[in-house]
A protein has these predicted regions:
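Long, contiguous binding/interaction regions
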Residues: 1-90
Length: 90
């Protein structure tokens, strides 16, 4: 069973969105999908808006579409796009 490293960019719907609540919900949903080694980084975009960059490891057979759909359905997340998708070795 191969594993992959994902980097997903989640865009909140406004600069006032609670980023910590989004991260907590994302971590919970990712864990239910079998993701491990979940980490987050906030990346400034413009006018006070920050993207949340989520990095995690997940079994390859889960697929990438389910990840985008699940994370984009979090309240106050306007979009979730996969920025990186790499197969791991070892």
């Amino acid at each position: 069973m191969a594993t992959v490293i994902f980097v997903v960019k989640m865009m909140p719907d406004s600069p006032e969105a609670d980023l910590e609540a989004i991260k907590t919900e994302a971590k919970s949903r990712l864990a239910k999908m079998g993701a491990t080694q979940v980490s987050f980084e906030e990346k400034p975009i413009a006018f006070g808006l920050k993207a949340i960059m989520a990095q995690f490891v997940m079994p390859e057979e889960k697929g990438s579409d389910i990840v985008e759909n699940e994370l984009s359905s979090i309240p106050h997340v306007s979009s979730a796009t996969i920025e990186e998708y790499r197969r791991t070795f070892g």
